[in-house]
Structure formats: C-alpha cells, structure tokens
Amino acid sequence: MTYTLNDWFGAKVTAAKTGVLLNNEMDDFTAKIGVPNLYGLVQGEANAIAPGKRPLSSMSPTIVTKDGKTVMVVGTPGGSRIITAVLHTMINVIDYGMNVQEAVDAPRFHQQWLPEATNVENFAISPDTRKILEGMGHKLGNPQPANHLAAILVGAPSLGGKPVGKNRYYGANDPRRNTGQALGY
C-alpha cells in the first residue's frame, strides 16, 4: 500500500476528528498549462483538471520477483524523482551486485525533460566529469531535496550473497534524510 501527501504535511488540513492529514494531490493536475507544479513538472492540456480524470503521479511501490518469489521491495516519496530513485536502487542491486544498503546509499541523478537540466547529487560525479558533460552541452542542475528511499531484500543482503537461515529480510534506509530506520530479521 502507498499513500501520498504530495508535499510536506499535504494540503496542511486534517480530517475532522481524526487528525489524518489530507493530501494535495491536485497539484499533480495541470492547474495552468505551461506553469510548473511543486516538483517542477511542466504539464499540458492532457493533464488538465476535468471530471473523471486521474492526476499524473509517479507513485511506484515496487516488488521485484524472481521465479515467482519476492526478492526485493523498494519505494520512496519524492514526486517526479520517485521513478529515478527506485530504478537507480534496483539497477544497483540487480546489475551491479551491491548489497541493499549500498544500493540505497549510492549517488543519484535525475532528469525529467522539462526543465531541461539533469540534477546531480553532490559527489555523484567528479568536477572533471561535470566539466566534460557541460562542455558537451548538458545542463547540470543543483541537487534537489533528497528522496527518502527504503528497500528490503529477501534472503540475503545482496542478490549474490549467501542466504543465512530461512525467510531473512534485510532492510535499508536512505541516509539522505534523518528519518526512519530499517531493520531486518
């Protein structure tokens, strides 16, 4: 299950008698064509507010399976950066053989087409690489506020790791925000 507030404290309104924060998911519709939303996404007529429509959303709670068995669960808040952060983590575990915490900790970059800039985390690339990319015409933006990714790997701390015991879960929590904690058993 996943839920979005969209922005810190959502719409900044709570449901009467419950204290449950209401989201501001309406920001994911195009309120005014060509004007960026909270996350800098510039949207058009196709995402205009209209009856019966669903807002554009990047929510991506992800379960990775192999041979019908769950091997990894990963998710994060972060608006337009969600898909990028989830994909980076999956690639780091599956293709680069990182353990789940290394995969979550690894530097990330994000490109969303509009605005035309690639946001790169500090220390993700060397100053020389930055200079080369900018010399090729790439626009490198400053890092955006961090996602707070969490991931669980089932069976071993990495896909290449040797399973220890039965039904072990290895959790990883993103150090970019000082919130939450992941534990495994």
Model regions and ranges:
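Proteins synthesized as precursors that undergo proteolytic processing into mature forms
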Residues: 1-144
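In a subset of proteins, long, contiguous C-terminal domains/tails are tracked
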Residues: 94, 127-185
